[in-house]
Amino acid sequence: MKSRVILNHRDRRDKNHNNNNTNHYTQVDTMERKPLEVEPSTTTTNTDVVDSFEEEQRKIVYRGWKVMPFIIGNETFEKLGIIGTLSNLLVYLTSVFNLKSYTAATIINAFSGTINFGTFIAAFLCDTYFGRYKTLSVAVIACFLGSFVILLTAAIPSLHPVACGNKISCEGPSVGQILFLLMGLGFLVVGAGGIRPCNLAFGADQFNPKSESGKKGINSFFNWYFFTFTFAQIISLTAVVYIQSNVSWTIGLIIPVALMFLACVIFFAGDRLYVKVKASGSPLAGIARVIAAAIKKRGLKPVKQPWVNLYNHIPSNYANTTLKYTDQFRFLDKAAIMTPEEKLNSDGTASDPWKLCTLQQVEEVKCIVRVIPIWFASTIYYLAITIQMTYPVFQALQSDRRLGSGGFRIPAATYVVFLMTGMTVFIIFYDRVLVPSLRRVTGLETGISLLQRIGAGFTFAIMSLLVSGFIEERRRNFALTKPTLGMAPRTGEISSMSALWLIPQLTLAGIAEAFAAIGQMEFYYKQFPENMKSFAGSIFYVGAGVSSYLASFLISTVHRTTAHSPSGNWLAEDLNKAKLDYFYFMLTGLMVVNMAYFLLMARWYRYKGGNDEDITEIETNEEETKQQQLQDKNSV
């Protein structure tokens, strides 16, 4: 059995300059440790911990695919329920609650942002206190209650304003009606915020990660997960939205409630069969310790050859990948400087982990800090996607939505399906055609690097916004210069331009997501330490949440600033009197600036373990590794 050590070319040059250092990022200078006192430890040894852990693992019964009908069934109905409730919420707020379009868009963006922020809180609570099963149990019930409350706002006349019809001035909702609606949205925040970071991991928990069949099962489960997600979105944005828009809001909202109830029943039916992983404590404490220790030691001078002279005890049951030393954020290195006052336990661990941290802990924090600039650029990018999920709906409402000569009208909210369709189709093309072609050119297994994939998504987002501006200019010109098709409720005249012209901008946005969104998920997953994978998933949603809040702020600011401008309100209720194309062009400029910033950060970024092109795997015998650990222990 062999273990792997990852070194890059620069590491090997360093190694040649230090002949006595066999493994320059794990060996500890014995001279630095002599003044230290060692406290006797009454705790169990690493060997005892490992044996106890392995014994506990052997007792776990992994049922794998036998419990997948419960998990995937719950996933399918839960997604159908949530998306069925939320997909047409923008139209619901404007047509049933008589809210202005910009007010409804602001509420939707704030609501989406809160859900995405909730994933971070849920990931923390899940890993630290409750575990995934208990978190999901609360979340699915909360989703059912939220969907039920939203249904009541449509079914009970006293819970929504009087129907407006074609009136120009409509009665708005009362405070009580708004509060009842917000209560339903609050339940959905708790539910969706808990489900998103935990569902994937809970499904993967049901497979044995050490067996070949278990590993294959995990990969297949991920495929089924994303299939059900896309399936639920398409069904909700077509069939459910059509019923809500053309049959009845009450019937259209009963369907998601019934589906959420089925999701709860199916989930709890498998209660006795699930593998329920206990909460193991939050890795956020480790981050806090490194920062606290570095601040306490801020007056110390940096050590020479930090990869040798910094404290770097590695327990035998250490789960994370061993990282090489990096010379970025050197202030954090001070957390691993050993002073004469600090003590070690007999097993080599620091007696006070808030004053002394290992080099590995420091490098893990560096990984997270290094990701933040990329995450910031990705957050700005999501402004484009957030806008493409809202304003094309308003454009469709004032465009010709007729399909064929039969008089069938495509519901306005359904046009967002073209974004997801573009994303789904391009993913297949990317995986089957583009990656093999790029692989022959670049020599990379993935065709292009993760940051290159994200950057390609940013480029398509810019193209999407630019096309959106030209399409909106065309739509408004048709409405102002050619015969219209009547009046849209509470907005203005319907342009004779076909709403199918919105497909190019939405398709480009879908391609942007195929590059950037999936690239970000993979990037965070691979660049975060192994014990922070749940947070790696949540940071993606947190970025989308920040973007939703930024979109709300941007919409409100533009609406307020341009309300009395000579050119007119850019985001007026009647798009024919607005300048939505100016808004799109402004966003295009913002995305270009963000792209330039991203390129600078991508050039500065260092991948965890080294660049893909610069990695050499050096295999060392396990016996040699044990001897090295024994030498480290003796030096203590």
From Swiss-Prot:
Single GO molecular function: glucosinolate:proton symporter activity
Transmembrane intervals: 77-97, 105-125, 136-156, 175-195, 221-241, 249-269, 367-387, 410-430, 451-471, 499-519, 535-555, 582-602
Induction: Up-regulated by wounding.
Coiled-coil annotated spans: none
Keyword terms: Cell membrane, Membrane, Phosphoprotein, Transmembrane, Transmembrane helix, Transport
Biased composition (Basic and acidic residues): 8-17
Main location as per UniProt: membrane
InterPro entries associated with the record: MFS_trans_sf (IPR036259), POT_fam (IPR000109)
Any one GO biological process: glucosinolate transport
Subcellular location: Cell membrane
Annotated tissue distribution: Expressed in stems, flowers, siliques, roots, shoots and leaves. Expressed in veins and in adjacent mesophyll cells in leaves, and in the root vasculature with highest expression in lateral branching points.
Chain spans, region Disordered: 1-45
Residues annotated with Phosphoserine modification: S52
Free-text disruption phenotype from the record: No effect on the total glucosinolate levels in seeds. Gtr1 and gtr2 double mutant has no detectable glucosinolate in seeds.
Tree of life domain: Eukaryota
Membrane topology: Multi-pass membrane protein
One Gene Ontology CC term in the entry: Golgi apparatus
Cited Pfam families: PTR2
Entry's family note: Belongs to the major facilitator superfamily. Proton-dependent oligopeptide transporter (POT/PTR) (TC 2.A.17) family.
PANTHER family given in the database record: OLIGOPEPTIDE TRANSPORTER-RELATED (PTHR11654)
Entry function: High-affinity, proton-dependent glucosinolate-specific transporter. Involved in the distribution of glucosinolates within the leaf, including import into the glucosinolate-rich S-cells located adjacent to the phloem. Involved in bidirectional long-distance transport of aliphatic but not indole glucosinolates. May be involved in removal of glucosinolates from the xylem in roots.
Protein name: Protein NRT1/ PTR FAMILY 2.10
